[in-house]
Amino acid sequence: VQHDSKRRPEERRFYTQVTDPMREARLIQDSGELEAALFRLRSADRLALDTEFMRERTYHPQLCLVQIGTEADCYLVDPLAPLDLGPLHVLLQDRSKHKILHAARQDLEVLLLSGGAVPGPLFDTQVAASFLGFPPQVGYAELVARQLGHSIDKGQTRTDWSRRPLTPAQVAYAADDVRHLLTLHADLQAALVAKGRAGWVAEEAAAYENPALYRTDPAH
């Protein structure tokens, strides 16, 4: 992702810079850790959500990591560890909790394959930004830089997420992918409401919850 320091007027920050209070990420690799994480996550009404996956060696993407954040906590759930992910998917499908993602479609595809349903309800910060004057495919790092003034290291973009153990650089990268999502959501949603465009984003998000979007035929 290129960090372009030049902003068009409509791409300026809508609010003053804030510091995200989210704690250091915790890697979840056993059932006890997952149970404790889910207990804390259930008290939140918004969940920052991202995944890491691999496509190169399989037709369908292989889920390698699920990152979930709240205002206070950040968890990296390891699907390659001996975990029952059923309770995690129940949480992701809980409609009392909004899931905040960036460029959500591929993440939703891999979560559908893993859990049998598309998480929801959704808010996609890339879609929201596009209705506020940003380029339609604005990257997460670029949006965070322009909107919040934070710099994100994207050096692990092409890393092998299926290898274990994860390196400290991978853990830091994965955590950064959710660390700013809740702040972005609050920022962008307020701007959308002010411009009368919040309904447009909600319609787009509702369409993303249709499982038919992610069904493919390997024969074609």
Feature-to-residue mapping (PLM):
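DEDD superfamily 3′-5′ metal-dependent exonuclease/proofreading module
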Residues: 5-6, 10, 14-220
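Polybasic, low-complexity intrinsically disordered segments
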Residues: 1-3
